[in-house]
Amino acid sequence: QAAASGALQGLRACAARVIPALLPFFVVSRMLTALPLPTPWRRADRLFRALFGVRAACLPALLTGLLGGYPAGAAAVTELYRAGALSKAEAERALCFCNNSGPGFFAGLIGAAVLGDVRRGLILYGLHALSALLTGLLLPGSAPPAALRTVRREKPVLSSLLPEAVQGSCAALLQVSGLIVFFSSMLAVLRAAGLTALLPNRLAEALACGALELSSGILLLSGHGAEAACALLMGWGGLCVHFQAMSLWQTAGLRPHGYFSAKLLHGLLSAVLALACFAPSPAALLSAGALTACALLAPLLRKIRAGNLRHAAV
């Protein structure tokens, strides 16, 4: 009975929040990658390589992830790789910082329902977006400048472009919804078995549940002082989100080995910045300043190291 109740709750969440929020971004992402559009961002390749170690072609995926939410960024990166806009190494690297949450989740669920202040939710979204960029800056190394795959595609027929994009997006959303229902059912069983009651306090329960399924953990938090915990969970994303992203990128043969470490780093960066913003203390401010400085210096250090390697080769 607990499993059925949890599954029903997951289905309601999919119908009310997940599908309406993600479907437009999934469809637009597929349509854009199918069209032979010009790529004006190629001029920014040198800047993007210095900052993030990938081509500037990942910018649409980064924006899609920050606007559409989990796992729209992973879907966009996968489509860019399929279209030949990113190499395999670049796509796997981009997945580590392009799969993020969107402003709707922060404003609606965190701001209005959890913190009771939409403005604080939007501030947390800004910190979440900043932490995603810092994560991309702090990733070690860079994707090798390999030649892009030549993808042979027929000229798209405009009359079939939208139906095909909707069909592919619905198939992807079916996988995403199935995982949400499964994790919701599993959490309901764990609660019914009394396993979550073994945790020492409500914060520990929220973090444990959120590590598995994001919204379940977020809803256990409330009031002032919950900002850092919300930021940590949103940066991490939860195993349910990660399995959703995996179901998308594995269909293209991608294997981003540093993905989980990057999402953990994203969560920690978000939590430190939230502490510095909402509960300022010397330690939190010092940590936030040090992390930001490291992120800003990372491109310079990467460029210096690349130059040293070239000189050594000569």
Where are these regions (language model features)?
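Alpha-helical transmembrane segments in multi-pass membrane proteins
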Residues: 21, 25, 29, 65, ...
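Alpha-helical transmembrane segments of integral membrane proteins
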Residues: 123, 127, 163, 167, ...
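Transmembrane helix-loop junctions in multi-pass membrane proteins
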Residues: 1-6, 33-38, 108-109, 115-118, ...
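Alpha-helical membrane segments and immediately flanking helix-loop junctions
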Residues: 51-115, 208-222, 228-252, 256-265
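Membrane-embedded alpha-helical segments and adjacent helix-loop junctions characteristic
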Residues: 1-74, 159-221, 310-314
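Hydrophobic core of alpha-helical transmembrane segments in multi-pass integral membrane proteins
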Residues: 1, 287-302
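Alpha-helical transmembrane segments of multi-pass small-molecule/ion transporters
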Residues: 95-99, 103-155, 184, 244, ...
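Intrinsically disordered, low-complexity non-transmembrane regions of multi-pass membrane transporters
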Residues: 142-167, 303-314
